[in-house]
Amino acid sequence: MHGITYDPVHDEFTVPQQFGQAILTYRGGANGEERPIRIIQGPHTQLDAPEHLDVDVAHNEIFVPTRQGSILVFARDGQGDVAPIRVLGGPDTMLGGDEPLVVDPVNNLLIVGGTAGRGQRRLLIFNRTDSGNVKPKAVIGGPKSGLYSFGGPFAVYPPKGEIIVSVRGPGPYEELSSDDAFVGVWSIHDNGDVAPRFTIGGPKGVLKMPRGIALDVKNRNMMVSDKRLNAVLTFHFPELF
């Protein structure tokens, strides 16, 4: 389980269950051994060991990447063995495997991680409602981008069109800590081999293996969890907002 999304409108949180081939939704105040209030599970779902997801509260949809290189979209209130309401996938999409994703509900975009060979990664930007074998409208990646193995779920700040990504760093030991790990910020308008507009971490920085990212808009802070440090770090980041 490498993804968890909180829905403040309905006070629910949703998680993927890799071994149960399921998407589980709990009430926000769940405690102890409590049953989920909804379960998406079964052969019609096409779920295959899901690890990541994002919930678009504005449009009541759940986005789930698959290991086969597709994105399954479900109704937020889906229950049981339900088929996705649409599927994004095919060779033109450049999707490949279960990579992190995030929805920008304001700018109507879907940002998905993709592979680029030799350990490099890229960001694929689609229209939120894209379905079938559709080419991304923009692709960010290349040596200048510094995109290697992704650390965890992405984040977006729609008012400024920003994409926030945790990157583990290059090399064959991407599962281990890296002095090159960083959090980078790109624009939804970027395309091609574009360097991040802002970075935290990098060569000899404090981050070793960044994973999750959360934004505290009110106080202009960014919180980053780091698996190797076993810590959550809070950075004051007014430039982001």
Where are these regions (language model features)?
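Structural motif
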Residues: 21-26, 70-74, 119-125, 172-184, ...
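Beta-propeller fold detector
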Residues: 34-42, 82-90, 134-142, 193-201
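Beta-rich, blade/repeat-based domains predominating
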Residues: 1-10, 43-61, 91-109, 113, ...
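Short beta-strand elements that form the blades of beta-propeller/WD-repeat-like
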Residues: 14-15, 64, 164-165
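Short loop/turn segments immediately following the C-termini of beta-strands
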Residues: 18, 28, 66-68, 76, ...
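Short loop/turn segments immediately following beta-strands, especially the blade-tip
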Residues: 25-33, 73-82, 125-134, 185-193, ...
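Blade-level signature of beta-propeller repeat domains, shared across WD40, Kelch, NHL, RCC1
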Residues: 209-241
